[in-house]
């Protein structure tokens, strides 16, 4: 037993040797003692080792087919985009691990460049959700930014460095962790320059923002103000290297299909060669850098986004599947909420189809499904939790379209107990 020489009753830490008078707390074990300072040190060591263990390792990095299979569980359709993103994400993190292990440069000195992603498709088709699901699967920090809020330095609006601050915040200000995160920039089509030909007038929310984004997307050592907002002298900055940050930039690119169609016609056989009747999504899949440049993206910006993936509009069948099939399908979420109150929630097939039809009618796609369900279920979600006589709520087509009251199936005995009460 560790004891100090001053007196038989004075104990000391078996690890650092400090006496009980030199520390705040001394905890006894079978023949040993440990002080609060050594406990804190042990906790720091464990946290560091756990942080290293949670980093993506080359052995543990899921292969493209595994990433695709995971996306399949949560995202309906969009197979082409899921495949493109699965490959892009795998190659990106494989490149990071190769650099960290010293194998990034082969014997011939070839260095693998970063491949950021451009995601094209209509609103409400799952672009943001694709990126979120990938980041969650890989356990990396994830930040979403809106390109329309950005302006070039010196003008009212957000600096591009504020995007990096969001990523740092998502990583709990652990910059090392943030440096391998994913940033999703939405509405990037809105920062296309206003005219195809460069103008002498300032385009502070268009070409100027594209120029400002170039460096951080390509990879640079950026200085980020910890409080956000504009930079000013004499303030402290957080330094972050964006070399290994994966950027996924996305937009609806309304009108891009017309540019692609015109280019395809021009290269067809004959003066007025008719273009085959092609859907918008088919045209998007044929996009080329020259089309994006004509749309208003500058060549340098296009060059930083070598991987182009496209998502398609969702039809009624796809929206019905989104409502019912994924692991966290919206219908299942609401059924679970009612189940907590001891009530069964049932949707008829035509009710679900009607919800999908409403989303198509509003032009909101998958993004609007939750809002429609909230509108339909709000009255019953308000009323049923206060009643003990309801066993099941049935939502029909008429409830969705005609705003009639849902069918409330009474229970045999008015003694409902929630799952929490049953386990008590």
Swiss-Prot record:
The keyword Transmembrane helix does not apply. Component of the ClpX-ClpP complex. Forms a hexameric ring that, in the presence of ATP, binds to fourteen ClpP subunits assembled into a disk-like structure with a central cavity, resembling the structure of eukaryotic proteasomes. The keyword ATP-binding applies. Belongs to the ClpX chaperone family. This is ATP-dependent Clp protease ATP-binding subunit ClpX. Gene3D superfamilies: 1.10.8.60, ClpX chaperone, C4-type zinc finger domain, P-loop containing nucleotide triphosphate hydrolases. Keywords: ATP-binding, Chaperone, Metal-binding, Nucleotide-binding, Zinc. It comes from the Bacteria. One of its GO terms (cellular component) is HslUV protease complex. Zn(2+) binds at residues 13, 16, 35, 38. It holds the Pfam family ClpB_D2-small. The gene is clpX. ATP binds at residues 122-129.
